[in-house]
A protein has these predicted regions:
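Glycine- and acidic-residue-biased ligand/ion/polar-headgroup-sensing regions
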Residues: 75-87, 92
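Conserved short histidine dyad/triad with adjacent acidic residue
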Residues: 39-45, 57-73
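A generic structural motif
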Residues: 90, 115-117
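A generic "binding-loop/recognition-motif" signal
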Residues: 75, 94, 110-111, 120, ...
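A short, N-terminal "cap"/entry segment at the start of jelly-roll beta-barrel domains
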Residues: 1-55, 144-164
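Hydrophobic small-molecule pocket/channel-lining residues, especially in calycin-type beta-barrels
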Residues: 66-67, 73, 87, 113, ...
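Short acidic-glycine-tyrosine-enriched beta hairpin
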Residues: 93-111
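Double-stranded beta-helix
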Residues: 117-164
Length: 164
C-alpha cells in the first residue's frame, strides 16, 4: 500500500530564529459575547488573531436554545465539534443527533445547520476557514428585527450566509 502525501505549503515564517508569539485563552474566561437568546460566544482565535487563516469559536447554547436552519457559505468552510450535550446537526440531507466527540465538516457551498433542541445546555467548537469576521455576524442578530426584508437579505449576503 502506497500512501500519497501532498506537499506541505510553502514556509510562511522565514526568520532565522524562532519568536515568542503563542498566546493562551483560559477555559474559565468569560464569554466575549452573550446573546439575548442565551448563547455564549467565546472568540478563541478570530480572523485578526490568525492573520485570516481561520476563526475558532466555542459556542455554548442554552437548553432548547435553537440555532440556524439549513444554509451555506460561499467563501469559507465550516466545521463543528461537539464538546458537550446533544446538538442536532444537518449534513445537507438529514438532521442527526451529534454527541460529545462528534465532528461535522462542511466545505464551501455545503448545506448545513445546527441547533440545540433538548432541555440541556450544549457546547460546540466552530471552525471557519479561511477566517472571516464572524463576530459581527454573531453580534448583529439583535438588529435584524429592525431591518426591512431587503436590508436583512443584504446583511446575510454581506456575512456569507445563504438560506436554503
Amino acid at each position: 500500500v502506497s500512501l500519497v502525501v501532498p506537499p506541505y505549503p510553502p514556509a510562511r515564517y522565514t526568520a532565522d530564529e524562532p519568536e515568542v508569539s503563542a498566546w493562551l485563552k483560559r477555559a474559565d474566561a468569560p464569554p466575549d459575547y452573550q446573546s439575548p437568546a442565551g448563547v455564549s460566544y467565546h472568540y478563541l482565535a478570530n480572523q485578526q488573531a490568525t492573520d485570516g487563516d481561520y476563526g475558532l469559536y466555542r459556542v455554548d447554547i442554552a437548553p432548547a436554545g435553537g440555532g440556524p436552519g439549513p444554509h451555506f457559505h460561499r467563501a469559507m468552510s465550516e466545521a463543528f465539534f461537539v464538546l458537550s450535550g446533544t446538538m442536532r446537526l444537518y449534513d445537507g440531507t438529514d438532521w442527526v443527533d451529534g454527541h460529545q466527540g462528534d465532528f461535522l465538516y462542511v466545505p464551501p457551498g455545503g448545506v448545513h445547520g445546527f441547533r440545540n433542541e433538548v432541555e440541556e445546555p450544549a457546547s460546540i467548537l466552530m471552525l471557519f476557514a479561511p477566517g472571516a469576521p464572524r463576530e459581527a455576524y454573531f453580534e448583529g442578530f439583535g438588529a435584524l428585527a429592525d431591518m426591512t426584508d431587503d436590508e436583512r437579505r443584504e446583511w446575510f449576503v454581506r456575512h456569507d450566509n445563504y438560506w436554503v
